[in-house]
């Protein structure tokens, strides 16, 4: 049985004070759920968030990292630095990183390898644009991303990787893939993992859906056979909405 995982991606939102208030508001309910809860905070809030979480079951996530250990990379942060702060999960390949910062599948692959080396658990984001979807290229795009992003990743490492299917056309737009459509693509991702590795790995890897997930549609999405969780954007910024998803 795959344990559901709900991750909130705050993007460039929340001050340290707002982060601490949010943690205080959700901690009790998030502690009693059987769902794994992850908060992907801005870099500036990670240290204080970790202190506030303490021995909580809620996991801490970061939103980006560089693939080098150190060096002349102004504005970047390394996996080792994140690990030192107590980070558990790391978003890699989010569509906004790919779109606005020219992140490629090759750099995504480097980041995954470095994250695993530092015992961070990657949440690998993949998904197609509206144009690619309308051109019936969704499966081709996903296959290319999975093939390159996981190049050289050993079978034993797959237990530490979460995959998030986030159709780019559904992020921040209010549009959502139907639960059936999302499950169809996620089942295909699971098939790709089976072909690359084996049945055991494909049946244990957790695959989330991301794209305008909110309390109103969380139950329907989570009831699909192959969907193991959600990567939540806007709805993760409000405690009541986020808890509504966590308690689907």
Swiss-Prot record:
Protein name, entry field: Triosephosphate isomerase
Catalytic activity: D-glyceraldehyde 3-phosphate = dihydroxyacetone phosphate
Record bears the keyword Magnesium: no
UniProt similarity note: Belongs to the triosephosphate isomerase family.
Subunit architecture: Homodimer.
Enzyme Commission no: 5.3.1.1
SUPFAM superfamilies linked to this entry: Triosephosphate isomerase (TIM) (SSF51351)
Active-site residues (renumbered): 94 (electrophile), 166 (proton acceptor)
Statement: the UniProt record of this protein carries the keyword GTP-binding: no
Native source organism of the sequence: Alkaliphilus metalliredigens (strain QYMF)
Binding site for substrate: 9-11, 172, 212, 233-234
Pathway: Carbohydrate biosynthesis; gluconeogenesis; Carbohydrate degradation; glycolysis; D-glyceraldehyde 3-phosphate from glycerone phosphate: step 1/1
Domain of life where this protein originates: Bacteria
An annotated GO BP: gluconeogenesis
Main subcellular localisation: cytoplasm
Major enzyme class: isomerase
Cellular localization per UniProt: Cytoplasm
Pfam families, sorted: TIM
Role noted for this protein: Involved in the gluconeogenesis. Catalyzes stereospecifically the conversion of dihydroxyacetone phosphate (DHAP) to D-glyceraldehyde-3-phosphate (G3P).
One Gene Ontology cellular component annotation held by this UniProt entry: cytosol
Keywords recorded for this protein, A-Z: Cytoplasm, Gluconeogenesis, Glycolysis, Isomerase
PANTHER family named in the record: TRIOSEPHOSPHATE ISOMERASE (PTHR21139:SF42)
GO molecular function: triose-phosphate isomerase activity
């Amino acid at each position: 049985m795959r344990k559901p995982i709900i991750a909130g991606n705050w993007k460039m939102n929340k001050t340290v004070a707002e982060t601490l208030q949010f943690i205080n508001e959700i901690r009790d309910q998030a502690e009693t759920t059987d769902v794994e809860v992850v908060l992907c905070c801005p870099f500036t809030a990670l240290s204080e968030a970790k202190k506030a979480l303490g021995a909580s079951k809620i996991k801490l996530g970061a939103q980006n990292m560089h693939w080098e250990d150190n060096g002349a990379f102004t504005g970047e942060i390394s996996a080792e630095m994140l690990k030192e702060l107590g980070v558990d999960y790391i978003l890699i390949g989010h569509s906004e990183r790919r779109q606005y910062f020219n992140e490629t599948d090759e750099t995504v692959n480097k980041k995954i390898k470095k994250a695993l080396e530092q015992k961070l658990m990657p949440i690998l984001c993949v998904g197609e644009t509206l144009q690619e979807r309308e051109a019936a290229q969704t499966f081709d795009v996903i296959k290319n991303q999975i093939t390159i992003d996981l190049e050289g990743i050993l079978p034993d490492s797959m237990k530490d990787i979460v995959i998030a299917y986030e159709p780019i056309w559904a992020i921040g737009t209010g549009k959502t893939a139907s639960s059936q459509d999302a499950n169809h693509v996620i089942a295909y991702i699971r098939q790709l993992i089976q072909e690359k590795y084996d049945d055991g790995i494909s049946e244990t890897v957790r695959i989330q859906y991301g794209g305008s997930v909110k309390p109103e549609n969380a139950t329907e999405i989570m009831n699909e056979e192959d969907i193991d969780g959600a990567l939540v954007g806007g709805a993760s910024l409000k405690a009541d909405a986020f808890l509504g998803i966590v308690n689907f």
